[in-house]
A protein has these predicted regions:
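Terminal presequence/propeptide segments associated with secretion/organelle targeting
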Residues: 1-175
Length: 175
């Protein structure tokens, strides 16, 4: 059994058989697909650190209480203690907006290790290697093809042995 982190875009052909043997009922395509709806489209990041779940076609999401605690607290008053009593909007007009809160969906995940490490082997010092990696990442973030409303971020995995580029879409109208 392989341990550690399983990157969704690499499940197909890499971990799918093992996951099926462990009892998984869905396919790797059901978990991650760029071309069809998949689990990645239903589990966005909530405010950069928490997971959330989309549970309606209108964008209703759920997350853990502690993830939205600050926003709940900011809307609470002595008369309306939402932390104690909860809150239920009966219409869209009653929903309470939350400034500086966003929900981010992954559009695609791509392995860009070759591009990030391009030219690094020819360098001798760790400082030179680090500077070139940072330059390559910066160039990729600027030039990677995406829609105007999408963001690109590159994350390192396995202690700098793999680099993955995430194309994301963020929504800031969270109520």
């Amino acid at each position: 059994q392989q341990g550690g982190m399983w990157i969704p875009s690499l499940l197909n052909g890499m971990n799918e058989t093992e996951m099926t043997n462990l009892g998984m009922k869905m396919s790797a395509e059901d978990i991650y697909s760029v071309n069809q709806s998949s689990l990645k489209d239903a589990v966005p990041h909530f405010n950069g650190g928490c997971t959330s779940e989309v549970i309606s076609p209108n964008g209703l999401i759920l997350t853990n209480h502690h993830c939205g605690y600050g926003e709940i607290q900011s809307h609470s008053t002595v008369e309306n203690d939402y932390l104690q009593d909860g809150f239920w909007a009966k219409s869209y007009a009653e929903e309470l907006p939350n400034e500086d809160l966003e929900v981010t969906f992954i559009v695609s995940i791509n392995d860009v290790t070759k591009e990030v490490l391009n030219g690094v082997d020819a360098l001798k010092t760790e400082g030179e290697k680090k500077a070139l990696i940072e330059k390559n990442i910066s160039n990729l973030q600027k030039t990677y093809k995406r829609e105007d409303w999408q963001n690109v971020m590159i994350r390192t995995f396995y202690e700098g042995n793999q680099y993955m580029l995430f194309v994301t879409e963020s929504f800031e109208d969270v109520r």
